[in-house]
Amino acid sequence: MQALLFISCGAILGASLRWAIGLLFNPLFSSFAFGALIANLLGCLIIGVLLGLFWQFPQISAEWRLFLITGFLGSLTTFSSFSSEVVELFFNDKWLNGFCVLMMHLFGCLAMTVLGIWIYKICSQLLS
């Protein structure tokens, strides 16, 4: 039951941030939901940093992992929103836009995760 509380608290914060990012960035582009891309890229960057942290300090409690990764990042990033946006573009015969959104999410998120790991490694070396 305690694990559910940690996940839920993290999810409240992640979902709230995702909503705020959507409000801020979605009006910038009419062709696709830019907020979802920003949320996914940011979430992947953060998870990269957290992976580096958890790898270096495996003694960090499982509660923090549940709160940050499962709860916060699980609700900040979402594959279902991304999928629906791409499919909607394809169904509206906006093939180029759909393909571009698909590639930006896929490669952008992978790159941000690696960047997050590198950022963590550099920061941990500078601080030690």
From Swiss-Prot:
A biological process from GO: cellular detoxification of fluoride
General function of this protein: Fluoride-specific ion channel. Important for reducing fluoride concentration in the cell, thus reducing its toxicity.
Keyword vocabulary terms for this entry: Cell inner membrane, Cell membrane, Ion channel, Ion transport, Membrane, Metal-binding, Sodium, Transmembrane, Transmembrane helix, Transport
GO annotation, cellular component aspect: plasma membrane
InterPro entries given in the database record: FluC
Regulation of protein activity: Na(+) is not transported, but it plays an essential structural role and its presence is essential for fluoride channel function.
Disulfide bonds: none
Membrane protein topology class: Multi-pass membrane protein
Protein name: Fluoride-specific ion channel FluC
Family: Belongs to the fluoride channel Fluc/FEX (TC 1.A.43) family.
